[in-house]
Amino acid sequence: MALSQATPFSATELLLASATFCLVFWVVKAWQPRVPKGLKSPPGPWSWPLIGHVLTLGKSPHLALSRLSQRYGDVLQIRIGCTPVLVLSGLDTIRQALVRQGDDFKGRPDLYSFTLVADGQSMTFNPDSGPVWAAQRRLAQNALNSFSVASDPASSSSCYLEMHVSKEAEALIGKFQELMAGSGRFDPYDHVVVSVAKVIGAMCFGQHFPQSSGEMVSLVRNTHDFVETASSGSPVDFFPILKYLPNPALQKYKSFNRRFLQFLWKMVQEHHQDFDKNRVQDIVGALFKHYEDNSRASGGLMPQKKTVNLVNDIFAAGFDPITTAISWSLLYLVTNPEIQRKIQQELDTVIGRARRPRLSDRSQLPYLEAFILETFRHSSFVPFTIPHSTIRDTTLNGFYIPKELCVFINQWQVNHDPKLWGDPSEFRPERFLTSHDTTISKTLSEKVMLFGMGKRRCIGEVLAKWEIFLFLAILLQQLEFSVPPGVKVDLTPTYGLTMKPAPCEHVQARLRFPIK
């Protein structure tokens, strides 16, 4: 039988199909970097043309990529749109990349959403990783840490952080009592978010921070407009056309960044009007003094502008993770009342009821500390670090990793790795205690990933851990949290840069003893 009779395709159609196949094959090969002899590219699943693995990622990329790591290993590669993305899982692999090979992986990808933060001048989101970035990071970290541990001579508190947290925690207790006297229930997030904002605001701006500003409250209660688009795998970063199409989430993100920057500008300018370099009492004052003393190194930017850019990062580092952690903690407490009772027994034994908890009590409250660590691990509310990128060609675990490759660090996978935790789905604070339940296991606590690693580690980590501890210690000393019988608390997170718990408007709080 002749070929023309055996096939329904014409010679022209077959030729066109062959040409198309060759073109697609050539494009795919062109996308792939040239791999040096003896090395290989990271493995990964087959991807759809144009859209890559976006359908695979779905609404919970941290879960999807954790499943893929079980099949392809700790170093795998996917595509989002046409952009290759390296995904790192496994504690040892991540530590190798971010710590031992930290200089190779310290970059940031040049993503569209990053350019909208602080007009593209954010130290945290900026692709720059050179000496200027390193100096700015040191300055921000030193300012934040200094005013966490520095003390106010007029206060009985050990440091500014303790003074501000104690004040806001007491105010929060009063607010919860007021809500209980009214509706008899509340959503803790709506009120925790304002209290935490007041703490970092007071540390940054001192008396200049507006404690009851409607603008401030509106901003901090709408941070979800930021974290949704700033999350790893945000479509707008990988599909450029989305910048030009109707996109409500992107518009909210732009609006939030614009409003937040304007708010900080106003605060910084007001502070600068009565700045006295001989009387520095907050982070902004310390930054003004630094830039004034080092005016030749200002890089052409006015002190106010440089200060706004840094405060944008400092405020974020000392605000959203802390708010999210406390909110998750309260929900774990109401769903695990026996754990709450153990924490309160520890507080009663160590501190009693005659005085308030202090930061110096932290080492004497191992069960509370274990609960906080388990909240970090189980919720993994920062599922990925802010994306990294490679600044030069390198290798990792025998795989060739080219320069300028976008890198996702899957912290959620580490915190739920059965090889590390045995029963990762169980909420069990005791796992972090030593055999005598008197101290925290340093080895195990260092395996919890929430603040990143290496040269891009979150500058607010120390502040966050201290502040979360003190807020919870004060709240739990005085209040017992619960939900009404029959109410089921939804612990399903909403994916974002930080994953928030679902709103829970049924939380109740009662005083454990009369407050003097």
Swiss-Prot record:
It is a peripheral membrane protein. Substrate binds at F226. It comes from the Eukaryota. Keywords: Endoplasmic reticulum, Fatty acid metabolism, Glycoprotein, Heme, Iron, Lipid metabolism, Lyase, Membrane, Metal-binding, Microsome, Monooxygenase, Oxidoreductase, Steroid metabolism, Sterol metabolism. Pfam families: p450. It catalyses: an organic molecule + reduced [NADPH--hemoprotein reductase] + O2 = an alcohol + oxidized [NADPH--hemoprotein reductase] + H2O + H(+); 17beta-estradiol + reduced [NADPH--hemoprotein reductase] + O2 = 2-hydroxy-17beta-estradiol + oxidized [NADPH--hemoprotein reductase] + H2O + H(+); 17beta-estradiol + reduced [NADPH--hemoprotein reductase] + O2 = 4-hydroxy-17beta-estradiol + oxidized [NADPH--hemoprotein reductase] + H2O + H(+); estrone + reduced [NADPH--hemoprotein reductase] + O2 = 2-hydroxyestrone + oxidized [NADPH--hemoprotein reductase] + H2O + H(+). The keyword Glycosyltransferase does not apply. Heme binds at C458. GO terms for molecular function: estrogen 16-alpha-hydroxylase activity; estrogen 2-hydroxylase activity; heme binding; hydroperoxy icosatetraenoate dehydratase activity; iron ion binding; steroid 17-alpha-monooxygenase activity. GO terms for cellular component: endoplasmic reticulum membrane. Transmembrane segments: none annotated. GO terms for biological process: arachidonate metabolic process; cholesterol metabolic process; estrogen metabolic process; hormone biosynthetic process; progesterone metabolic process; retinol metabolic process. Glycans are attached at S69. Its cofactor is heme. Pathway: Cofactor metabolism; retinol metabolism; Steroid metabolism; cholesterol metabolism; Lipid metabolism; arachidonate metabolism. It is found in: Endoplasmic reticulum membrane; Microsome membrane. Its EC number is 1.14.14.1, 4.2.1.152. Interacts with PGRMC1; the interaction requires PGRMC1 homodimerization. A cytochrome P450 monooxygenase involved in the metabolism of various endogenous substrates, including fatty acids, steroid hormones and vitamins. Mechanistically, uses molecular oxygen inserting one oxygen atom into a substrate, and reducing the second into a water molecule, with two electrons provided by NADPH via cytochrome P450 reductase (NADPH--hemoprotein reductase). Catalyzes the hydroxylation of carbon-hydrogen bonds. Exhibits high catalytic activity for the formation of hydroxyestrogens from estrone (E1) and 17beta-estradiol (E2), namely 2-hydroxy E1 and E2. PANTHER family: CYTOCHROME P450 1A, STEROID 17-ALPHA-HYDROXYLASE/17,20 LYASE. Belongs to the cytochrome P450 family. This is Cytochrome P450 1A2. The gene is CYP1A2.
